[in-house]
């Protein structure tokens, strides 16, 4: 049995003169929760449609369980799709919606009832079998759509932005339910979203896409903490970008980098030559803020002076926008409440307040400047 349940090989898709996928290679592991993440128009839904059989690649191959299924129609692939709109039949009961697929394939009698009720029980809707879709909440309709896909016992379940129509709290709850369901069933899930937080919280691996190309494939932690290029760094979460120049190379993978007059010894996973322009990337939560009266003159000499331009209270955190004095660049920082600061006064920043900024060296990512 192959480790990979579904695979794209050199898949290209063009509509007339417009190419929306450029020679994509993708292997989906058996039993994993894989998310295709990217902005609108990046090609993620096109990949889903190629896997489902709703579209055929212009060039390239689709394999399912090691077999070439490029020419097979959707009903012969062992793959089911949950659509963004759910596509439930409004005139049918929940039971009949879920039973629709097996009935088409000739399943009936006690076997049909057993399979339908098992699917409804799996999504915790076994008590709703005789209701109509209009009598259900958005989250319940979502679960009916999932049950309708699961009742066919697919090798792979494809989900096309299927949480986007839900409100914030329900969407968060369904993220947890979907991941638990996938783990319980052991079925491969391929999920499409443009929501970075959704991708990071649910996935075993994330495929980051842009302009019809795969930019990076990795675990949520890898794509967040070790982005392979500036697009991934900027699209997956927020990030600050400082442009610098390599002024010395050391043999241990560390470099002296000049950031507008501050020469800092930093380590990089990539190789750079003296004189190379680089982007030093720092997440907002990794920046540290020094206020007036904190640190000695010697401490502050190597830090970046700035001014607080905006204070954004978010309940559990306070976000600051700081304008650097030397370059006029804006940095975004996230400050967390301290349990020893019951009044929250330590995060009581003022617009216009002078501050200094630095970070723990080693938490940055250094990439070639683009």
Predicted features, each with a name:
Residues 239, 249-370:
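Non-catalytic connector elements of ABC transporters
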Residues 33, 74-234:
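ABC ATPase nucleotide-binding domains
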Residues 52:
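Helix-to-loop junction immediately C-terminal to a conserved catalytic motif
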Residues 37-39:
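The feature captures the beta-strand-to-loop junction immediately N-terminal to the Walker
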């Amino acid at each position: 049995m192959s480790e990979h349940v579904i695979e794209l090989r050199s898949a290209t898709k063009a509509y007339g003169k417009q190419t929306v996928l450029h020679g994509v290679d993708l292997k989906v592991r058996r039993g994993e929760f894989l998310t295709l993440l990217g902005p609108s128009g990046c090609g993620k839904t096109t990949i889903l449609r190629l896997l489902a059989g709703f579209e055929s690649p212009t060039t390239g191959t689709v394999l399912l369980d090691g077999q070439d299924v490029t020419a097979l129609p959707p009903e012969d692939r062992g793959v089911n799709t949950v659509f963004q709109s759910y596509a439930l039949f409004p005139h049918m009961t929940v039971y009949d919606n879920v039973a629709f697929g097996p009935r088409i394939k000739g399943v009936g009698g006690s076997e049909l009832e057993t399979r339908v009720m098992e699917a409804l029980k799996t999504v915790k809707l076994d008590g709703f079998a005789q209701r109509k879709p209009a009598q259900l909440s958005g989250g319940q309709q979502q679960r009916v759509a999932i049950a309708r896909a699961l009742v066919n016992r697919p090798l792979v379940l494809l989900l096309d932005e299927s949480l986007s129509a839900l409100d914030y709290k329900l969407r968060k709850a369904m993220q947890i339910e979907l991941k638990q369901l996938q783990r319980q069933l052991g079925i491969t899930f391929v999920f499409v979203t443009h929501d970075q937080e959704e991708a990071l919280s649910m996935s075993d691996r994330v495929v980051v896409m842009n302009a019809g190309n795969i930019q990076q494939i990795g675990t949520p932690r890898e794509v967040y903490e070790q982005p392979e290029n500036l697009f991934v760094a900027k699209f997956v979460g927020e990030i600050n970008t400082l442009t610098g120049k390599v002024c010395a190379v050391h043999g241990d993978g560390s470099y002296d980098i000049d950031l507008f007059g501050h020469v800092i010894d930093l380590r990089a996973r990539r190789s750079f030559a003296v004189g190379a322009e680089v982007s030093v990337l720092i997440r907002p939560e990794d920046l540290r803020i020094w206020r007036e009266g904190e640190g000695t003159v010697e401490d502050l000499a190597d830090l970046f002076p700035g001014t607080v331009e905006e204070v954004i209270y978010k309940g559990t955190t306070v976000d600051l926008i700081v304008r650097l004095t030397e370059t006029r660049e804006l940095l975004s920082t996230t400050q967390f409440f301290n349990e020893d600061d019951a009044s929250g006064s330590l995060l009581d920043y003022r617009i216009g307040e002078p501050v200094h900024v630095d970070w723990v060296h080693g938490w940055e990512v250094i990439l070639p400047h683009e």
